[in-house]
Design a protein with these regions (language model features):
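Conserved acidic catalytic loop of the alpha/beta-hydrolase fold
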Residues: 24-42
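Active-site nucleophile elbow and catalytic-triad environment of alpha/beta-hydrolase enzymes
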Residues: 142-159
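Conserved alpha/beta-hydrolase catalytic His-Asp/Glu region
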Residues: 101-144
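Flexible "cap/lid" loop of the alpha/beta hydrolase fold
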Residues: 67-98
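Short glycine-enriched nucleophile-adjacent loop
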Residues: 51-62, 68
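Acidic catalytic loop of the alpha/beta-hydrolase fold
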Residues: 174-178
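Catalytic active-site module of serine/aspartate enzymes centered on a nucleophile-bearing elbow/loop
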Residues: 193-235
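Short beta-strand/loop motif that positions the catalytic acidic residue
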Residues: 163, 169-171
Length: 235
């Protein structure tokens, strides 16, 4: 079903939430992708909204997830993990890009604000990715529809409290898009979750942090991978 895209300003102000589209739909799409690829289960790593989707998959489809890694995400709880006032203002006043160059320049501007101030800013990389995103879809309908779906899903603290798979939560201490309290709340809500703060990291994945993040994920997923391999051998 192709629903009309919500008004982005109304979404940011707390209105125009299409109840027929939420994180549960995106989680179901994720499981559908696993089915299409022929995977019984997987190690899920989600970033930002992807973290919310991964959390929802782990909560609603526990048998399909080996481990969960949630990065720069939150629980949806009110006043927790929210954007900084300066970020809200930039999002609410941003004019939709009229062409590819405006989209690229806009991405550079926002990521200079929400990015990792503790690491060098790679403008070339941001421009490249923004161009790819524009070429894939030159409208903002998908973005605003997904953002509305996040708001419509509300507080998921109780739901993710039922997650039983090993969980790693990573969050930068300079995040202006999702305040670090979002990561703290996520780790507190999920039983036995491990929380790691990345000093100097904002709401992106700077190249300088990749090594540390990859090591954390590798260490986190290794035990579950060994258990699964052993079970398959015994079967």
């Amino acid at each position: 079903m192709d629903y009309p895209a919500p008004n982005p300003i109304a979404v940011l102000r707390g209105g125009n939430h299409p109840r027929q589209y939420h994180l549960g739909d995106m989680a179901r799409d994720t499981v559908g992708l696993l089915d299409a690829l022929g995977y019984r289960d997987a190690h899920l790593v989600g970033i930002s909204m992807g973290g919310m989707i991964a959390q929802t998959v782990a909560a609603q489809y526990p048998g399909r997830v080996r481990t969960l890694t949630s990065i720069m995400s939150n629980t949806g709880a009110p006043r927790i993990g929210r954007p900084a006032p300066s970020t809200w203002w930039r999002m609410a006043t941003a004019r939709p890009p009229r062409n590819r160059m405006e989209a690229i320049d806009g991405a550079v501007k926002i990521f200079k604000h929400i990015g990792s101030h503790g690491y060098p800013f790679d403008e070339g990389w941001v421009r490249e990715k923004a161009g790819v995103a524009w070429d894939r879809d030159p409208t903002s309908d998908g973005v605003t529809r997904q953002l509305a779906g996040v708001f419509a899903s509300g507080d998921r603290t109780a739901e993710i409290g039922a997650i039983e798979v090993p969980t790693l939560v990573i969050h930068g201490d300079r995040d202006r898009m999702v305040h670090p309290t979002g990561g703290v709340a996520t780790a507190r809500a999920i039983p036995r979750a491990k929380f790691v703060t990345m000093p100097g990291m904002g709401h992106d994945l700077p190249f300088g942090a990749w090594g540390r993040i990859l090591d954390l994920i590798a260490d986190h997923t290794a035990p579950a991978s060994v258990v699964t391999a052993t079970n398959q051998e015994q079967a």
